[in-house]
Design a protein with these regions (language model features):
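Short beta->alpha transition motifs characteristic of CBS
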Residues: 36-39, 84, 107
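Conserved active-site alpha-helix within GNAT-family acetyltransferase domains
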Residues: 62, 87-105
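Conserved hydrophobic beta-strand within the GNAT/NAT acetyltransferase core sheet
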Residues: 47-49, 81-85
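Acetyl-CoA-dependent GNAT
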Residues: 1-56, 71, 124-128, 132-139
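Conserved acetyl-CoA pyrophosphate-binding loop and the N-cap/start of the following alpha-helix
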Residues: 55, 59-68
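C-terminal "cap" of GNAT-fold acetyltransferases
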Residues: 79, 86-90, 106-139
Length: 139
């Protein structure tokens, strides 16, 4: 979370982007996570998430990601949400697969002037809505 909040972090990066939505999660009045949906072209947005390090592994990432997808595909009306995730983050990759994201490729970026390897994943609105319908009928 710290890297996303610093002066040149994600919040600053997306501060002036048109059609950008930010969602936050607080516990006891403290920010513990936030997500961003930043429009990349009509009907599509990039997803980013940041969690406080002491809150990982507790299901918070899944909750806030699910709520963000619901807003993005529902209220906002997006048709595609895409993301990049570090290749060395297996828990996040598993979460995105469980939520219906599909692997589309790989990319490399410099993060803090060091090379980092990422997976590119996306989720289409139709696939998201179909998976929600299946989940509801299984209940």
């Amino acid at each position: 979370l710290d890297y996303a909040l610093r002066q040149d972090g994600w919040l600053a990066e997306f501060q002036d982007w048109p059609n950008t939505w930010r969602f936050s999660a607080e516990q006891s009045g403290e920010l513990v996570a936030f997500t961003i949906l930043a429009t990349t072209k009509v009907g599509e947005a990039e997803f980013r998430i940041a969690l406080r390090s002491d809150k990982t592994g507790q299901g918070l990432g899944q909750i806030i990601t699910s709520q963000t997808l619901e807003k993005g595909f529902g209220e906002i009306g997006l048709t595609r949400i895409h993301l990049i995730v570090r290749k060395n983050n297996p828990r996040a990759i598993q979460l995105y697969h469980r939520l219906g994201f599909t692997l589309r490729g790989e990319c490399h970026k410099d993060v803090n002037q060091k090379p980092a390897h990422f997976l590119i994943m996306d989720l289409q609105q139709d696939d998201y809505l179909a998976s929600r319908t299946i989940a509801k009928t299984r209940r």
